[in-house]
Swiss-Prot record:
This is 2-C-methyl-D-erythritol 2,4-cyclodiphosphate synthase. Pathway: Isoprenoid biosynthesis; isopentenyl diphosphate biosynthesis via DXP pathway; isopentenyl diphosphate from 1-deoxy-D-xylulose 5-phosphate: step 4/6. The lineage of its organism: Bacteria, Pseudomonadati, Pseudomonadota, Gammaproteobacteria, Thiotrichales. Involved in the biosynthesis of isopentenyl diphosphate (IPP) and dimethylallyl diphosphate (DMAPP), two major building blocks of isoprenoid compounds. Catalyzes the conversion of 4-diphosphocytidyl-2-C-methyl-D-erythritol 2-phosphate (CDP-ME2P) to 2-C-methyl-D-erythritol 2,4-cyclodiphosphate (ME-CPP) with a corresponding release of cytidine 5-monophosphate (CMP). It comes from Francisella tularensis subsp. novicida (strain U112). PANTHER family: 2-C-METHYL-D-ERYTHRITOL 2,4-CYCLODIPHOSPHATE SYNTHASE, CHLOROPLASTIC (PTHR43181:SF1). Gene3D superfamilies: 2-C-methyl-D-erythritol 2,4-cyclodiphosphate synthase (3.30.1330.50). HAMAP family: IspF. It comes from the Bacteria. Its cofactor is a divalent metal cation. 4-CDP-2-C-methyl-D-erythritol 2-phosphate binds at residues 10-12, 37-38, 59-61, 64-68, 103-109, 135-138, 142, 145. Transmembrane segments: none annotated. Binds 1 divalent metal cation per subunit. GO terms for biological process: isopentenyl diphosphate biosynthetic process, methylerythritol 4-phosphate pathway; terpenoid biosynthetic process.
Amino acid sequence: MSFRIGHGYDVHKFTSAKQNIIIGGVEIAYHLGLEAHSDGDVLIHALCDAILGALGLGDIGKHFPDTDNQFKNIDSKFFLAEIKKMLDEKQYSINNIDCTIIAQAPKMLPHIEKMRACLANILEIQISQINIKATTTERLGFIGREEGIATHVVCLLYR
């Protein structure tokens, strides 16, 4: 059996030009939005990078560049579905995924189960294979000042 580990990281800053945010494929009511070329889903972006990294296929920017207008304002679930196809082509399966959302606000806990269900559905895995946790920076740094949100994702693949 062959195992591969991937790590992904993403960060987006808040903007007053939008309202509400999308994290893990779930829309969350908030007075600000996230600045991004796509929908700004930091969790899905980091997850895509984790899977691509484990497969040795670069990163999300290589496959879906922010200079390409076809990806402007696109739903990030599209990226994850395309990367799932790459995973299948390489004949790897997901053992588990562990995600950390780092945000001072809004609170993520009420939305985590919906996020897990959304991601499991796209990746065609069990919800139990995905863990999502949220933390703050205790008001330190740009996240603590509520200027943005970051995520880390680790995935373990096997074949």
